[in-house]
Amino acid sequence: MNEQKMNEQMKKTAKTSGQKGPGGRALDRLTLKQDEARPVQNTRVEAPRVTYTIRDESEISPETEEDGFPDGYLECIIRGEFSEPILEEDFLFKSFESLEEVEQNLSRQVLEASSLLESSLEYMTKGTKQEKTEVTQETPPLRVGASSLLAGGPAEKPEGGVYCGVLSMLECPQAGCKKKLRGKTALRKHMLVHGPRRHVCAECGKAFTESSKLKRHFLVHTGEKPYQCTFEGCGKRFSLDFNLRTHIRIHTGERRFVCPFDGCEKSFIQSNNQKIHILTHAKAGKKC
């Protein structure tokens, strides 16, 4: 009876094999245990053959060299801490490129500045040359006239014909003054006489047109003569240094002022004496 019940139960489980409940699961466990209890057949399982190639350290392919990152670096990339691998070689290469660009820019700026300087110097030299040529073309050659000699100062005898017509006298335009003067400079100086006399002496009331003349006149009242001749046996004193210099020429024999006319060898210590001598040539009508 027990065996019949067992068979019926087995049939029921076979019919309901599509729907596994708790009983089905238990049956599965039972069958697994029965399978484990069975003897294992002698089956030969071959292990997979793994071949390893050992290369020298010098023989590294470019693929392994490019992908040869450290493990920690790869972990950082996987985590997302680094977006792109940054190599030291790339950084150095970029820095060298930037330095080369800077050097090129500097050299370009230096070349531009030097070319600009050369062009400006060339322009300046051209301008000065043109100005010199214009001045030499327009300006006639100057000669030393009698007016410069009459103004005083040492001079050599000029060539003949220089003083022809130069000694023409200029008449004072002031009414009642018939004085004639040599040149415009002498005339301007003479016109100060006719001007207002603003500089008045406090001692005698004499007025002067220039302050320098008032100072010179005031030495007459004071009697001051600070300039003394140092030559032995002379000892003369003068109120002005100009008079002392003129006096010293008497001792030295220096005659700086030479007659400018040809054939006349006269020379003078003072410029006033030279001017008076030149007038004698003009009055005599001596031709140049």
Curated annotation (Swiss-Prot):
One Gene Ontology MF term: DNA-binding transcription activator activity, RNA polymerase II-specific
GO terms of biological process kind: cellular response to leukemia inhibitory factor; genomic imprinting; in utero embryonic development; positive regulation of transcription by RNA polymerase II; spermatid development
Annotated region described as Disordered, given as residue ranges: 1-48
Keywords: Activator, DNA-binding, Isopeptide bond, Metal-binding, Nucleus, Repeat, Transcription, Transcription regulation, Ubl conjugation, Zinc, Zinc-finger
Protein location: Nucleus
This protein's GO CC annotations: cytoplasm; nucleus; protein-containing complex
Pfam families, per database record: zf-C2H2
UniProt keyword Transcription regulation, yes or no: yes
Record's signal peptide: none
Biological role: Involved in the reprogramming of X-chromosome inactivation during the acquisition of pluripotency. Required for efficient elongation of TSIX, a non-coding RNA antisense to XIST. Binds DXPas34 enhancer within the TSIX promoter. Involved in ES cell self-renewal.
Family membership: Belongs to the krueppel C2H2-type zinc-finger protein family.
Protein name: Zinc finger protein 42
Organism: Mus musculus (Mouse)
Gene of this entry: Zfp42
